[in-house]
From Swiss-Prot:
Protein name: 2,3-bisphosphoglycerate-independent phosphoglycerate mutase
Entry keyword set: Glycolysis, Isomerase, Manganese, Metal-binding
Cofactor(s) the record lists: Mn(2+)
Function of the protein: Catalyzes the interconversion of 2-phosphoglycerate and 3-phosphoglycerate.
Gene responsible for this protein: gpmI
Active site: 62
Length: 514
């Protein structure tokens, strides 16, 4: 039998930083947490970048942190998932991408690659286009054309020219691909049914009509000279001997490498819908092999999807319910959605046997005015839940280090950490009184850096710092391994509870024999 209850305590925004300047966690008097880190197994865990499914070097956040924890696996966003598949090589075996390539081989037709030429990472990423060019090269395709949509919103307003030059260099290096047209996202990525804009983009792509230029870099330079930046570049076709070099024709293949749906739908409708009524298509719907990077809209026909959405099944909450275990989720308002909706993989409804205990956050303009927030009331509910012995598992979040950390006010953040430390002490005493077990962690850093080390200004964002993992009152013959991440926490709890990890969870338990 395992000990009961098993408590997962999340100290929101409690990161670990070796510098003490602007570090509310180092500057706070926190006798309880200091003692627990000394007396019990303690390691640093990774809560940012690829370790939580975000781009390398990107700070973690509460939504992503709780999603990864509850899932017991790294949950990759589309951006990182596709990037990772390119790195791992799975990308080059993707069934739908291969289908587009094979169609070109069979019909001796062109492969058109279009999407937002940008490293903004919001709608697309230029490295994904490079992956597609590599795919075309591996298959020996010769008629490969890029239709570049220029950004200037998620990137600098005139960065398009440098992206274009980088793309030209990559195509020269690979020996495959030519830029056939250039269009500002204003025209081709509308999302408000402004079909007059989309029509201009479509005319350039299919009919070879629009502003004419000898090459893409020249087209962009000319647009800048007119005072028109990336977002608003008029649909422009690259011409040779007065004719567009590569209008899209029947039986061609298109791969649209935007992964965010909202601004990819309209142009996709224009290509794929049989009874399209946004504007008149001169040739009607062209028969094409049209592949979208993600599912833009299930109602759009005549297309396929390269990267289907991954649903998160068998989260920790589901798993506990399936095994007849009881669970409590406790948080104040600010973090209530995180310990419920996000922890459950984006599912709103509670699981069987899951009690949700909400404590109202204080009604103040900013939390530096009340840095203790509602931590004491959360601790009251937590102590009550522990000592009731009603629950097999209790998941609790203390919001203070994050919410007060966001104000950038050091004195308040120090008080916030001290308030939480006292609450941890109360929970620890209650836990020992019933011989329960606990794992303390954080979802990302924040309160440990309240100053920008480059310029001395207040720093109010999350960080990429590691977070604490502390194992409380489990089994003295075990310790924790280094190098873990948030996805490893639930597999650890499952082992602590002497249960079997489900196959959907790919995180690895942090427990190791001493």
């Amino acid at each position: 039998m395992s000990k009961k209850p098993t408590v997962l305590m999340i100290l929101d925004g409690y990161g670990l930083n070796e510098k003490t300047e602007g570090n509310a966690i180092a500057l706070a008097k926190k006798p309880v947490l200091d003692k627990l880190m000394k007396d019990y197994p303690f390691v640093k865990g990774n809560a940012s970048g690829m370790a939580v499914g975000l781009p390398e070097g990107q700070m973690g956040n509460s939504e992503v942190g709780h999603l990864n924890m509850g899932a017991g696996r790294i949950v990759y966003q589309e951006l990182t998932r596709i990037t990772k598949e390119i790195q791992d090589g799975d990308f080059f075996e993707n069934t739908q991408l291969i289908k587009a390539v094979e169609n070109c081989k069979k019909n001796n037709t062109a492969l058109h690659l279009f999407g937002l030429l940008s490293d903004g990472g919001v709608h697309s990423h230029i490295t994904h286009l490079y992956g597609l060019l590599e795919l075309a090269k591996r298959h020996g395709l010769e008629n490969v054309y890029v239709h570049a949509f220029l950004d200037g919103r998620d990137t600098a307003p005139t960065s398009g020219k440098s992206f274009m030059e980088a793309l030209e260099a990559k195509m020269a290096e690979l020996g495959v691909g030519r830029i056939a047209s250039v269009t500002g996202r204003y025209y081709v990525m509308d999302r408000d049914n402004r079909w007059d804009r989309v029509e201009k983009a479509y005319a350039a792509l299919v009919d070879g009509e629009g502003v004419e230029a000898a090459n893409a870099v020249e087209a962009v330079a000319a647009s800048y000279a007119e005072g028109v930046n990336d977002e608003f570049v008029l649909p422009t076709v690259v011409v040779k001997d007065g004719k567009a070099i590569a209008p899209i024709k029947a039986n061609d293949s298109i791969i649209f490498f935007n992964f965010r749906p909202d601004r990819a739908r309209e142009i996709t409708r224009a290509f794929c819908t049989d009874d399209f009524d946004g504007f008149v298509r001169k040739s009607g719907r062209l028969p094409l092999t049209y592949v979208c990077f993600s599912e833009y809209d299930v109602t759009i026909p005549n297309k396929s999807v390269a990267f289907e959405k991954v649903s998160i099944t068998n989260t920790f909450g589901e798993y506990l319910a399936e095994h007849g275990k009881t669970q409590a989720r406790i948080a104040e308002t600010e973090k209530y959605a995180h310990v419920t909706f996000f922890f459950n993989g984006g599912v709103e409804a509670p699981n069987e046997g899951e009690d949700r205990i909400l404590v109202n956050s204080p009604k103040v303009a900013t939390y530096d005015l009340q840095p203790e927030m509602s931590a004491n009331a959360v601790a009251d509910k937590l102590v009550e839940a522990i000592t009731s012995l009603k629950y097999d598992v209790i998941i609790v979040n203390f919001a203070n280090p994050d919410m007060v950390g966001h104000t950038g006010i050091s004195d308040a953040a120090i008080k916030a950490v001290e308030a939480v430390d006292a609450c941890v002490g109360r929970a620890y005493d209650a836990l020992l009184s019933v011989d329960g077990q606990m794992f303390i962690c954080a979802d990302h850093g924040n309160a440990e850096q309240l100053v920008d080390y480059t310029n001395g200004e207040p720093f109010t964002a999350h960080t990429t710092n590691p977070v604490p993992f502390i194992l409380i009152n489990y089994d003295d013959s075990y310790t924790l391994r280094e190098g873990g991440c948030l996805a490893d926490i639930i597999p650890t709890l499952i082992e602590m509870m002497k249960m079997e990890q489900p196959k959907e969870m790919t995180g690895k338990s942090l427990l190791i024999k001493k």
